[in-house]
Amino acid sequence: YKNRIVIPFEGSYAQFEHVIHHELVHAAINELVYGGNAQGLISGRILLQVPLWANEGLAEFLSVDWDTNSDMVMRDLAIEERLPSIPELNYSILAYKGGQSVWQYITQKYGREKVGEIFQQMRRTQNAERGFESALGVDFEKLTDDWHDFLKREYWPDLVNRENFDDFSTKITDRSKTRNFYNVSPSFS
């Protein structure tokens, strides 16, 4: 292990710039939490494991701040009332967009300086959840509730201005009758 980062180039300079920033954030987290030596984590000498959502989410947040793709994902989850708890973000691709959203919330509510404090507290306590609680003064359950409220206040007002699909359209398929989950290449007959 040589404390290196890999930066792939896929042909787009904009994407390349994003990847550089993203990977450098991982290097900074590694330095801050593990003193630049993640070998202790691999060998089992260091017990602290930064949650995937916190690591990937912060890398996304600091490399692109907030973007339309992230906004679209989080808007859909909030409107459909399918927001996961913060610990549940670890188990899906939402570690990136959901984690990015959590960091957006934290920086807006508590300030950007809390980001470094959270990681310092993680290192001090050797526990991610206690690090967040020590820095923010709330546990993950309360942080989850507050984050959900933040997203609902942001996105639910959009629903007021939308028409109900049933008011201007006619349903042409009925899933309860066809027992299918999605329609591919629908055609009128």
Describe the role of every protein-language-model region.
Residues 1-4, 8-169:
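Acidic/His/Gly-enriched intrinsically disordered linker/tail segments
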Residues 170-189:
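Beta-strand-rich domains and repeat architectures in extracellular enzymes and scaffolds
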